[in-house]
Amino acid sequence: MARAKFERNKPHVNIGTIGHVDHGKTTLTAAITMSLAAQGKAKARNYADIDAAPEEKARGITINTAHVEYETEGRHYAHVDCPGHADYVKNMITGAAQMDGAILVVSAADGPMPQTREHILLAKQVGVPNIVIFLNKQDMVDDEELLELVELEVRELLSDYDFDGDNIPIVAGSALQAVEALTANPGIGKGENEWVDKILSLMDEVDGYIPQPERDVDKPFLMAVEDVFSITGRGTVATGRIERGKIKVGETVELVGIKDTRNSTVTGVEMFQKILDEGMAGDNVGLLLRGMQKDDIQRGMVLAKSGSITPHKKFESEVYVLKKEEGGRHTPFFPNYRPQFYIRTTDVTGAIESFTADDGSVAEMVMPGDRIKMTVQLINPVAIEQGMRFAIREGGRTIGAGVVSKIVE
């Protein structure tokens, strides 16, 4: 059977549902697909479909994630929902499912709970830029004042973590009521059912409040070097996948990381032995570099637009440490532990200087299965930036995954 062509006629945005266990994330995901399916903009997915999320691996870590897609009038969305709390933590830290924005689901009957707070903190740390709120289970709250109180609490909580708590859109409704109405009558249109309308107005807010992400091709050029060859009579070629931006012959790039930063001019761009006018984000290319010897370049360096990225040795990060069952360590580790940090394309040794818990207290040690904030000092400077993902490895196996939350030096 021929594969259906992906129609790129609308801008694409990645979002996900986050929030405390049993507040209704998966039911809301089902309600969104069902209410948009009634308008022919999605394939209806029920709770059981989404809840039976397949396992996938990201940076050596197994995560259960459900991916659904749907469209609104102006956009195409890929939506990720995770069955378990640990899956969210792993997902957000590894960046397995990048989110341009999130829908935070809070049960109006219970108000914000510990995981509500933890997911907001994670969203902040890993760089989910925008959040829209759905106050679920509105049908279980008779008292209008109680609803307002929960809304106030949620806004304060978001402001605590530097989100724009005062202006974030909040929509109240009941995902379950919408799902039940749509199960009984899958063709419900706008204005025919109050609960379905609330889901549609949530999606209007998502459309309006979550900005269109800047596409990778529009960002400054960056490619992490995977391999280096010298071609007799032509010069030195660095290969890798272009992470962002575009590159063409005659442009100047900087070689950043491990050694001192140097400039070079690109004299050729090739992909699969064919000459390209221009390499773009996502392409695997070989770049021919003027005036470079094979020994000047090594795996783990990056080629980037001049001045767009700088090498650093010290950073703060948010890390998930694998459990023994996930192939991680069997024992805890302590400050000054020196594993390898796999950053883009290479391992760099680094010392973990200190650990901090969510409440700011200093932790003495880290157990497998923990999520922790850690300060890392690398032995060589490499090109790193805020929001970048990395893996922590020991003897070739992954023992943790992290994201850079702040550059120190």
UniProtKB/Swiss-Prot annotation:
Alphabetically ordered keywords of this record: Cytoplasm, Elongation factor, GTP-binding, Hydrolase, Magnesium, Metal-binding, Nucleotide-binding, Protein biosynthesis
EC top class, as a word: hydrolase
CDD domains in alphabetical order: EF_Tu (cd01884), EFTU_II (cd03697), EFTU_III (cd03707)
Renumbered residue ranges of the record's region G2: 60-64
Keyword Cytoplasm attributed: yes
Chief location bin: cytoplasm
GO CC aspect terms: cytosol
GO molecular function: GTP binding; GTPase activity; translation elongation factor activity
Residues binding Mg(2+), per UniProt: T26
This protein's record includes keyword Cytoplasm: yes
One of the Pfam families matching this protein, by short name: GTP_EFTU_D3
Region (G3): 81-84
Compartmental location: Cytoplasm
Annotated spans, G5: 174-176
Catalytic activity: GTP + H2O = GDP + phosphate + H(+)
EC number: 3.6.5.3
Residue segments, region G4: 136-139
Disulfide bond entries: none
Annotated positions binding GTP: 19-26, 81-85, 136-139
Residues in tr-type G domain copies: 10-214
InterPro entries: EF-Tu_GTP-bd (IPR041709), EF-Tu_GTPase (IPR050055), EFTu-like_2 (IPR004161), EFTU_2 (IPR033720), G_TR_CS (IPR031157), P-loop_NTPase (IPR027417), Small_GTP-bd (IPR005225), T_Tr_GTP-bd_dom (IPR000795)
Region (G1): 19-26
Family note: Belongs to the TRAFAC class translation factor GTPase superfamily. Classic translation factor GTPase family. EF-Tu/EF-1A subfamily.
Functional summary from the UniProt entry: GTP hydrolase that promotes the GTP-dependent binding of aminoacyl-tRNA to the A-site of ribosomes during protein biosynthesis.
Quaternary structure, from the entry: Monomer.
Record-given protein name: Elongation factor Tu
